[in-house]
Amino acid sequence: LEKKPIIGADLIEAYRVNGWWVVDKKGAHEVGDLVVYCEVDSWIPHTLAPFLTKPGHYPREYLGVEGERLRTVKLKGQLSQGLLLPLVEDNSEEGQDFSEILGITKWEDTRYMANMDARGNFPDFIPKTDQERVQNLDRTLEKYFGQSFEVTVKRDGSSLTAFVNGEESGVCSRNVNLKETEDSAIWAAANSLSLIPKILSTGRNLALQGELMSQKIQGNYEKVQGIEWNCFDIYDIDTQEYLLPKERRELCKQLRIPHIKVIDDAFVLCHNVDQLLEMAEGPGVNPGVKREGIVLKSNEAAFSFKAISNSYLLKHG
């Protein structure tokens, strides 16, 4: 744990955990302390932190639990992302996960998924589409300095995975395997792009993963007309490995599958967390749209992460 004063603030100061800055009461923690850090987009039960609910308001409810979602905020000009709590156990160790003990879950926007029929759970032979945030890799990045990375735009939509595994095929949202119904926008998008037939044409067991955007998803932040889907990953189910960026791009071109926008296909990593967060700022794909952030994937190894634009988080996150 590190800390620094906030100019013009007498009662609060900024504390740094890994790559995250959190504003808390002055003197609440000391340099080197072990604390429980709750990341942005955590759902914090009201019983754990009632002060997160605005005075005079009732707590919100998510998955049957009253509480609040942690968002990115600015206090006295200082970015604050997360919440610091005292240790739960005296014999706690660095890196220990207390989410289950404290009843903290990850918040996800379920409004768009409310009317979707699940065929089953997300397949256990495919990883879910989730990248680690760069702030959690503060001590890891140096291991990859000098390596070549692909840098792509991160778009604000909904995850779509189409797969073929032997006789089984399907289309999934971020968390579930979906039934093919007439009103399923995800299945409609997969069918319009012939994703499953295109996988079958390769003779391989693959999962195509990408971002689905439309006028009905996430308030159409990306300002798309109709439906757009961009592939950002291809997973080889037999080898249980993601294709490296170059092979993925080549296969997308061969199959005529729309690929996510590439900013740099040979970016040499030698940047710290703050520098990568600065890189996350910038234009998106469509005119007048700022990007949600960037995703970096090693051209040499199975290592990838995301850097989300702080200006995006302050306005939309």
For the regions a protein language model found, what residue spans apply to each?
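Core nucleotide-handling region used for phosphoryl-transfer chemistry
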Residues: L1-G317
